[in-house]
Amino acid sequence: MISGFSLISIISFILCITLGMTVYLKKVRYIFYNKLSKIFVVLCLTLALFWALIEFGYRSASDFSTAYSWLKLNVAWYFVMSFLLHFLLLYTENHHLLNRKIAYLIIYGPAIIFFLIDISTNLLFTNPVLESWGWTFGIPANPIIHSISTTWAAFTALFCLYVLLDYSEKLYNINKIKQTRIIIFGICIPIIIGLNTEWLFPILNIKFPELIVPSLTFGLIIMWYGIWIYSPLENKNYYEVIKTEVDKTIRNSGY
């Protein structure tokens, strides 16, 4: 059963894959030291393969067993939030935090815990439920762990916004200010939509499909547009960039 919302999920998958591969080919492949681009590529691919594609699978499933099989695969979306935080900490130059091992435990620890709980129990999600837009996940009768996971995801997103706002106040370069404002706009889209469809609507008992995947996809496109359009690197000739890297490699090899 393919609905309009199922199509939104598969379109998000295609856009994320395209965005991730575009960034890889333009940045990571030739600029070996660019950690920001590498994390962004991983973020895009994780969102595409472990969230958008799986969401399309269970939403468009023809029966309960197919939807159940797809939902059992929906256990790694937590890492999207971790990669998003890691990406924005890199962008905002929080190197003093990222140089500490404890920071990675804080960034990725909760995602690992929720991942392990999700693959071994039904404390986070239960059997699929058929709605007018397709199949969706069921909420446990005792939703404590589920509430903790969604609260963590919301807090992580809001913390990302705080990090960007704090960073923007310290900037003096006009292009960097404009770039950061675009990224702030990009992160606000999934925050506003996600807080409504994932948190407020369920509290008000309003049945509405989750839109965090397409909103985050759109947000990532806007974020990378801001980085790309105001990046000094884009004004350089790629030949010169590659030549510099090749020359450096030759010198280091001793030839």
Where is each model-derived feature located?
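Juxtamembrane membrane-water interface segments of multi-pass membrane proteins
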Residues: 22-33, 91-101, 162-180, 230-240
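Individual alpha-helical transmembrane segments in multi-pass integral membrane proteins
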Residues: 2-16, 31-122, 143-158, 206-221
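Membrane-interfacial helix-loop-helix modules of multi-pass inner-membrane proteins that assemble, modify
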Residues: 121-134, 203
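Short, flexible helix-adjacent loops and helix caps
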Residues: 26-29, 57-62, 173, 200-201
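Juxtamembrane membrane-water interface segments that cap and precede transmembrane helices
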Residues: 129-146
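Interfacial "cap-and-anchor" motif at the non-cytosolic start of specific transmembrane alpha-helices
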Residues: 2, 6, 54, 168, ...
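Membrane-cytosol interface motif
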Residues: 243-255
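Hydrophobic membrane-targeting alpha-helices
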Residues: 20-23, 52, 56, 87, ...
